């Protein structure tokens, strides 16, 4: 930052979640430095906050090996061009938002040119391919981490890291309104309610839906009034789920929802879900849960050898113990899933204790992440 020009921040976001984070960061920085300039790779939200887009975010938003290989030449061209243009611009700080396969190499290129670099959102280095931490350490001046155990991991390897809390924890209330959520979904206040969330990817929905539906059938025998809500992320997943349901449980009445995962969690007495971000969101919704997950046998065999953590779900990683039951692979079958869910639907001591711990964990990661991230950027820009 010099007298001649405003604070200049370069950013690269590669997908919608990064665009949301980038927009929140830009908003928080503009409150402190109104004339700051923002340039880079941005989605519509970042652009709405005033970020000048040298490339559209969609250019980087490719998933799957085949898709990446098909776009590889273009991706390499974009990275080389950004390395050159950011090198000429000399921004006060570069912030790579998630998209580690693209951003960490770019961060390393820029750091060699004397540009300060931040990687916002830690890759899951604490879980697998842990040696990536050394590459991240060489490429960045600072990592911004959502979760406290991530910072503890970086500290172990002397890689500068700041725990800023989780934006989702900031966005969700400490005490969600269950009755309001039930009003929205048309669920009676006095009914038992179960949310089924079989994942957002096609492979997950294919692997888990049948067992989740059979579990719901078993639970309905104990709770005849059981309302079952199934939020699905898009029309393709809904169509896939409906096909599986027609084959497995055609007579089971359920509420199929387009999106509305958060409302379903808040409204429910218990949830059965695939692991991933949904488990964190469910914890923040204060909905007691069971995690069920299944993958192809070879993939599971490989994962067991690569993954270095005792648990797969974020609530358990945050708690440092099995707070939430995880039933994986052969264990992920209807009888065991139903047995784990029954005490949660009873809404007694087990679910109350889980709810209280969820609230404590929510408070731990509710730190106003946008503000914390902005503060970290400004400190590095000094």
UniProtKB/Swiss-Prot annotation:
What GO biological process term is on the record, naming one? lipid A biosynthetic process
Which controlled-vocabulary keywords does the entry list?
A: Glycosyltransferase, Lipid A biosynthesis, Lipid biosynthesis, Lipid metabolism, Transferase
Keyword presence, Nuclease: no
Please name the pathway: Glycolipid biosynthesis; lipid IV(A) biosynthesis; lipid IV(A) from (3R)-3-hydroxytetradecanoyl-[acyl-carrier-protein] and UDP-N-acetyl-alpha-D-glucosamine: step 5/6
Which InterPro entries does UniProt cross-reference here? Glyco_trans_19 (IPR003835)
Regarding protein family, the annotation reads: Belongs to the LpxB family.
Question: What is the protein's known function?
Answer: Condensation of UDP-2,3-diacylglucosamine and 2,3-diacylglucosamine-1-phosphate to form lipid A disaccharide, a precursor of lipid A, a phosphorylated glycolipid that anchors the lipopolysaccharide to the outer membrane of the cell.
User: Which NCBIfam families does the record associate with it?
Assistant: lpxB
Write down what this protein is called: Lipid-A-disaccharide synthase
Q: Which organism is it from?
A: Escherichia coli O157:H7
Write the gene name.
lpxB
């Amino acid at each position: 930052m010099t007298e001649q020009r405003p604070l200049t921040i370069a950013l690269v976001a590669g997908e919608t979640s990064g665009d949301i984070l980038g927009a929140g960061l830009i908003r928080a920085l503009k409150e402190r430095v109104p004339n700051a300039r923002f340039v880079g790779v941005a989605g519509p939200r970042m652009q709405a906050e005033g970020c000048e887009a040298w490339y559209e975010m969609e250019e980087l938003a490719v998933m799957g090996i085949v898709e990446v290989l098909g776009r590889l030449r273009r991706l390499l061209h974009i990275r080389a061009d950004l390395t050159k243009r950011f090198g000429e611009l000399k921004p006060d700080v570069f912030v790579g938002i998630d998209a580690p396969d693209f951003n960490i190499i770019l961060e390393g290129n820029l750091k060699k040119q004397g540009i300060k670099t931040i990687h916002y959102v830690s890759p899951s280095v604490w879980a697998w391919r842990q040696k990536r931490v050394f590459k991240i350490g060489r490429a960045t001046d600072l990592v911004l981490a959502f979760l406290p155990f991530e910072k503890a991991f970086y500290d172990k390897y002397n890689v500068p890291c700041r725990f800023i809390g989780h934006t989702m924890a900031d966005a969700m209330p400490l005490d969600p309104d269950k009755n309001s959520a039930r009003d929205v979904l048309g669920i009676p206040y006095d009914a038992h309610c179960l949310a089924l969330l079989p994942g957002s990817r096609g492979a997950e929905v294919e692997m888990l839906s049948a067992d989740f539906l059979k579990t719901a059938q078993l639970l309905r025998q104990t709770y005849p009034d059981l309302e079952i809500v199934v939020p699905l992320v898009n029309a393709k997943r809904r169509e896939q789920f409906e096909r599986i349901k027609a084959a497995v449980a055609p007579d089971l009445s359920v509420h199929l929802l387009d999106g509305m995962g958060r409302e379903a969690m808040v409204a429910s007495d218990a949830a059965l879900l695939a692991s991933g971000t949904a488990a964190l969101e469910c914890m923040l919704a204060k909905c007691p849960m069971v995690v069920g997950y299944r993958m192809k046998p070879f993939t599971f065999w490989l994962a067991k050898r690569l993954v270095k953590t005792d648990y797969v779900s974020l609530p358990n990683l945050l708690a440092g113990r099995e707070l939430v039951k995880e039933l994986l692979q052969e264990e992920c079958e209807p009888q065991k899933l139903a047995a784990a869910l029954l005490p949660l639907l009873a809404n007694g001591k087990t679910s109350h204790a889980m709810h209280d711990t969820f609230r404590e964990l929510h408070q731990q990661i509710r730190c106003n992440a946008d503000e914390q991230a902005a503060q970290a950027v400004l400190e590095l820009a000094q």
